[in-house]
A protein has these predicted regions:
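Class I S-adenosyl-L-methionine-dependent methyltransferase catalytic core
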Residues: 1-171
Length: 171
């Protein structure tokens, strides 16, 4: 495992250098350095991510020499409707920011997912929910579902940011 300089984690983080991992062309993905810092800070042996996007969590875990369980709508896992397949000691969650970036049919083909996995990802894509109230309801459901899948004493880190529209902050 590579030697990693520990950075202190706060509620606000900034990584001027993104680092390697995931696909920086996949809109909305985070720096793998954040995930590596979480792995280091909590001395993790495994990390789970149920909305893994471009695979940044998996890449960071591989770089740090630990296991990962990563899933996404585009790879056959629907957090709204599927059971979480394992108990988690640590879950990382970076959900979509309402309607800022749409994923199904923009970042990946919904038709291909439907053909491969038998469901239409647009029906469960949080980034396609039309009202703020329904989005928050779905987010709360997904949050509690992941929380309930934690092992006793397990932890969950959630990466969120501001939603800004017309120069005013919504959240």
């Amino acid at each position: 495992m590579p030697i990693q300089q520990k950075r202190s984690l706060t509620s606000i983080v900034s990584y001027p250098e993104r680092g390697d991992g995931g696909n920086n062309k996949y809109r909305g993905n985070c720096s793998p350095e954040l995930i590596k810092d979480l792995i280091s800070h909590f001395s993790l042996k495994e990390i789970n991510d149920y909305m893994c996007g471009s695979g940044t969590t998996c890449d960071a875990a591989n770089d740090m020499g630990i296991g990962s369980n990563v899933y996404d709508l585009h790879s056959g896992f629907d957090l709204l409707h599927h059971d979480i397949p394992e108990r988690s000691g640590f879950t990382f969650w970076h959900p979509p920011y309402f309607d800022i970036i749409q994923y199904s049919d923009v970042m990946y083909s919904a038709a291909e997912i439907q053909q491969k996995y038998g469901y239409d990802p647009r029906q469960s894509d949080l980034s396609r929910i039309s009202t703020w109230e329904e989005f928050v309801k779905a987010m709360n459901y997904c949050m509690m579902k992941q929380f309930c899948a934690l092992e006793k004493g397990g932890r969950m880190a959630v990466l969120v940011g501001d939603i800004k529209k017309k120069a005013s902050s919504t959240v």
